[in-house]
């Protein structure tokens, strides 16, 4: 494997992580087999004591314990992966990574007007690109409803949330709403028809000032947002507020975790890790916030 040499990034810990992945799979398999055999033995014992009605509770408890233990092993390996792989790739771009860091719910609410009672943020990449300070992270937001028998979870958003700063300050608020999202997006102000037909096909634009919207959404920026929307093939919405832009890409997945069903150290996997980080870091560079949007 030539993972260490790919793009000059030192990923020499991948082979050790792959050994841990294989060991975890073997351990999980043994736990399932032994747990199943144990349940059979104990259920037979309970039946001999005429306590067969306890079998159901034993089964539920056993499944819960196995699931929790195996999930713990998985999370431990993922944490090591983020520390030894994702962090190294991010630092190669001259940026910083915090596995437990993230943007706030208030940042999420800059774009979304959703009823949320469960959320978390993780895997924050932050720093400066081309004079633009930014933060981006994996963000999850959902509404949990407690019913009589079970809890229903409605996922409102799961994807990348980005916050970046630019040098000029706007006197208006501008919302760029993906047309595939028919609800939960903020859309204050009046509808603004922009001069880019392709942009208008993908987005609805709302603003508190029509002139400011055309000042902020330059032809270059509209083209870049359209390109990003096509590239990720997922709902993308944004808001311009004072000297900040917030972007949400609803990918419906965690973006910085490995596929533990595949070898961690294969060249294909390594290329995917690098491309995964690169795709999101390049968002800031592609937008060219402090280069092409507003002239001094």
Show the residue positions of the predicted features:
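Transmembrane-cytosolic junction motif
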Residues: 25, 62-88
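Intrinsic disorder/low-complexity detector
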Residues: 1-8, 32-35, 49, 294-296
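Juxtamembrane membrane-interface segments of multi-pass membrane proteins
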Residues: 2-13, 78-94
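Charged, low-complexity intrinsically disordered regions
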Residues: 87, 91-143, 147-296
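Cytosolic juxtamembrane N-terminal segments of multi-pass membrane proteins
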Residues: 1-29
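Core hydrophobic alpha-helical membrane-spanning segments
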Residues: 37-41, 60-62, 108
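Hydrophobic alpha-helical transmembrane segments
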Residues: 45-60
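Transmembrane alpha-helical segments and their cytosolic interface motifs
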Residues: 26-41
């Amino acid at each position: 494997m030539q993972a260490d040499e790919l793009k000059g990034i030192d990923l020499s810990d991948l082979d050790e992580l792959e050994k841990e992945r294989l060991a975890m799979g073997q351990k999980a398999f043994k736990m399932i087999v032994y747990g199943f055999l144990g349940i059979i033995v104990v259920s037979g014992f309970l039946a001999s004591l005429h306590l067969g009605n306890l079998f159901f509770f034993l089964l539920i408890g056993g499944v819960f314990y196995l699931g929790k233990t195996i999930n713990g092993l998985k999370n431990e390996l993922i944490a090591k992966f983020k520390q030894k792989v994702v962090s190294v790739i991010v630092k190669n771009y001259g940026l910083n990574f915090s596995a437990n860091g993230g943007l706030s719910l208030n940042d999420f609410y800059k774009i979304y007007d959703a009823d949320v009672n469960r959320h978390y943020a993780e895997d924050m990449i932050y720093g400066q690109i081309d004079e633009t300070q930014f933060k981006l992270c994996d963000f999850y937001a959902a509404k949990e409803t407690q019913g009589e028998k079970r809890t229903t979870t409605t996922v409102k958003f799961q994807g990348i949330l980005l916050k970046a700063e630019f040098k000029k300050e706007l006197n208006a608020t501008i919302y760029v709403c993906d047309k595939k999202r028919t609800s939960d997006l903020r859309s204050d102000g009046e509808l603004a028809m922009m001069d880019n037909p392709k942009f208008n096909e993908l987005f609805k634009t709302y603003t508190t000032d029509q002139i400011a919207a055309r000042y902020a959404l330059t032809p270059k920026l509209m083209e870049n947002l359209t390109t990003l929307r096509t590239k990720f093939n997922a709902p993308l919405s944004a808001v311009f507020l004072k000297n900040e832009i917030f972007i949400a890409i609803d990918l419906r997945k965690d973006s910085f975790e490995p596929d533990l069903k595949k070898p961690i150290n294969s060249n294909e996997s390594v290329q995917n890790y690098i491309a995964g980080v690169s795709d999101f870091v390049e968002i800031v560079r592609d937008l060219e916030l402090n280069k092409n949007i507003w002239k001094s």
